[in-house]
Design a protein with these regions (language model features):
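Short, Lys/Arg-enriched anionic-surface-contact patches
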Residues: 4-26, 71-75
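Long, charge-rich, low-complexity alpha-helical segments
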Residues: 27-76
Length: 76
């Protein structure tokens, strides 16, 4: 399993404390927005000068957050 803790950082001095890829100012939310828009991990990596492992770490981080937080979706 991907150890996202080695690649994702939260630092109040960088991007106002938003989660970013280590050594960059690329926010996790930007990578996820691009994935949601249909971009491939390879396209995102190239566009933002990341590695595929960085993109995979973002996905693993998001999966971990999804386990921890309940977001109400409304009733049917």
């Amino acid at each position: 399993m991907m150890n996202w803790q080695e690649r994702i950082v939260v630092d109040p001095e960088i991007c106002h404390g938003k989660a970013c890829v280590r050594g960059t100012r690329v926010m996790v939310s930007v990578v996820l927005d691009n994935l949601a828009a249909g971009e491939t991990p390879a396209e995102i990596a190239k566009a933002y000068h990341l590695t595929l492992e960085d993109v995979q770490a973002v996905i693993a981080y998001a999966a971990e957050l999804a386990k921890e937080r309940f977001v109400p979706l409304g009733s049917r």
